[in-house]
Design a protein with these regions (language model features):
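Amphipathic protein-protein interaction modules
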Residues: 58-124
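Acidic, proline/glycine-rich low-complexity IDRs
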Residues: 1-16, 104-147
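A sequence-level detector of short linear motifs
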Residues: 36, 90, 141-142
């Protein structure tokens, strides 16, 4: 197995130990930031790589939909952050602070799902991350706040 693959000019290196052992780790631009992308697939076929590119492109094109899905389930985070920061944080402030911290893509056929963690800057989530899941049919849901 090759220990490196190139996807759209980005190097992905095979992780031989640790939490992502057996997966390829690289960086891609998501929502204007260099973001860790974990790509797990047994065969590094062209079809699998195209699926990864499709998922990342979809995420870049659907930022507003992702943020809307998060806010729909977690609107109370604004009040929590306002209390923690002892200042009024508006919904726009909170939305503007959200970014994708990392993305995990496991290619398993046509309906492959992927997940990613939303983070904030400033740290309105107080060290936590919001895990988001996108189904093979591109349905978005928040799987909870971790950390």
């Amino acid at each position: 197995m090759d220990n490196m693959i190139l996807i759209e000019g980005n190097k992905f290196k095979l992780q031989e130990d640790g939490i992502y052992s057996g997966a390829y780790l690289g960086k891609m631009n998501i929502w204007g930031r260099e973001t860790d992308v974990i790509f797990e697939n047994v065969d590094k076929s062209e079809e699998a790589i195209e699926k990864l590119i499709e998922k990342v492109s979809w995420l870049n094109d659907n930022k507003l939909n992702v943020i809307d899905a998060f806010m729909e389930e977690n609107y109370e985070c604004i009040e929590f952050a306002s209390e923690e920061f002892d200042t009024e944080i508006t919904e726009d402030d909170f939305r503007d602070a959200l970014f994708v911290g990392n993305i995990y893509i496991f290619i398993n056929g046509k309906d492959s799902e992927f997940s990613f963690d939303l983070d904030t800057e400033p740290d309105y989530l107080c060290g936590h991350l919001a895990n988001m899941i996108v189904s093979g049919k591109y349905e978005i849901e928040c799987d909870g706040i971790n950390g």
